[in-house]
């Protein structure tokens, strides 16, 4: 039986780097080797569309945690609104005793963190320390994230990319 992975992502059509990475995963061997369920927490559009997408995602995630019971939750996070949307997912997974991998994409996450008050920094640390692993996109990001989570829990995985054959001929 395949292990179940719930991947928490932006909409497959949203603009941005996380979407490119996630769409690469969707079309890779990963979805053959694991039973992957994707939950979209963000979409491009109006405030109403974005809020509706997030609320719908929380309900889907609660249902998934309770009834599908994934072996792992893989959260793709960034700074700003992305952090806050994923924080609730991490909290729900933690309460459900589901391990979480936090894949941090935001190049400006360290600045987001550093500009926060001590109280908000502690909140960020508390949430991110509920994750069993944190994925950094470079050694430099690993150093920055080590201010928030224990360095031994951080792994460096460069952005996923697919080369188009016509570009390398």
Tell where the protein language model's regions lie, with residue ranges:
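N-terminal subdomain of nucleotide-sugar transferases
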Residues: 1-43
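Nucleotide-sugar donor-binding and catalytic loop/hinge architecture
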Residues: 1-4, 164-169
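Cofactor-binding loop segments of dinucleotide-utilizing enzymes, especially the Rossmann-like FAD-
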Residues: 10, 41, 105, 139, ...
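An amphipathic, basic-hydrophobic alpha-helix
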Residues: 34, 47-96, 119-122, 126
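A short, histidine- and acid-enriched strand-loop-helix "catalytic/donor-clamping" loop
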Residues: 78-82, 98-117, 132-133
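Donor nucleotide-sugar binding/catalytic pocket of nucleotide-sugar-dependent glycosyltransferases
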Residues: 123-125, 129-167
């Amino acid at each position: 039986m395949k292990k179940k992975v719930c991947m928490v992502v932006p909409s497959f059509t949203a603009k941005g780097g996380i979407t490119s990475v996630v769409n690469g995963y969707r079309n890779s061997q990963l979805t053959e080797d694991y039973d992957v369920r994707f939950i979209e927490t963000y979409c491009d559009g109006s405030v109403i569309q974005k809020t509706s997408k997030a609320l719908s995602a929380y309900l889907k995630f609660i249902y998934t945690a309770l009834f599908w019971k994934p072996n792992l939750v893989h959260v793709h996070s960034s700074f700003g609104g992305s952090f806050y949307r994923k924080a609730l997912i991490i909290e729900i997974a933690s309460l459900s005793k589901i391990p979480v991998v936090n894949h941090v994409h935001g190049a400006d996450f360290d600045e987001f963190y550093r500009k926060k008050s001590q109280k908000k920094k502690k909140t960020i640390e508390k949430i991110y320390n509920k994750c069993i692993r944190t994925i950094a996109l470079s050694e430099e990001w690993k150093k920055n994230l080590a201010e928030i989570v224990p360095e031994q829990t951080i792994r460096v995985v460069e952005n996923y990319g697919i080369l188009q054959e016509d570009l390398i001929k």
